[in-house]
Amino acid sequence: MSSARGLVLVRMGRGHHFGALLAVPAAGRTWDLAVSHYDGSDLPDGAIVEWHQRCLGGKWDGIWQFFSAYPEALAAYDFYWLVDDDIEADPATVNALFDYVRTHGFELAQPALTTDSYYSHRITLACPGFRHRHTNLVEIMVPILARDTLHRVLPIIQQTRSGFGLDWLWQRFVTHPCKQIAIIDALPVRHARPLRQTLRPAIEAQGTTPEEERARLVCAHGLSRLHGVAIAGVTDSGRTIQGRLRMALALAITYWRQRKQIDKRPWGVEQTGLLMYRQLFAPLGFSKNGK
């Protein structure tokens, strides 16, 4: 373990897209790297890691097992990037991500996704013109958690393999959610594989499905479906845009201009209208009553 204040923890297997981050000398990064294998694959030759583990199964049960095996890691870092192995990023971007969340005091954040990424939530796609947007949603594939937030979330992580439903819940554990949750547009990464194809079979082999796990979280914590909403944003010029209506207009215009670059799922009039509707009316989910 080094003096780095950030930890990148990746659940990794065959066919990963993580090679650019595996052989970075410690002197070239401000973070430590932990690799937790979810299958029988091995570290490639030349990999430089501070932590290594093998735990067959899903993403989040592996993360729980990692911190159970290495409890000292829970106190060693200020921020934790719990990232999927099909995320493509370069070392400079990861260095900058940790610097960005530290500088802005975020407790829960994620990098935006490039427009050629496979994506679940439209709001997670990079929005040109913004440095970052304050949102109610950080998805489970690329979250960055502050240490205290991770400690609050860990008991919930113990209950899930897939993580389905975590992104409907963990914003409740942030101290000031309107200010400390963000999608960072200035530092996008690429999600390279189609959604939900890699770990689902391993989870189903253990007698459950991601949807069943989410249903249990919904029941246990009084959750409802959460749609991503941007409540404020900081532009490239440093100007702050406040309010759901103003952000709805800014996002609709910007994403419309980018629609031809969003090539994994179509973006047209219907998607733009749905984005604006949710921006204006969807509950934020910061508390049990949905606010």
Q: Residues of each region from the PLM?
A:
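Short glycine/serine/threonine-enriched helix-capping/active-site loop
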Residues: 36, 109-114, 184-185, 191-192
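Active-site-proximal specificity loops/subdomain of glycosyltransferases
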Residues: 21, 29-78
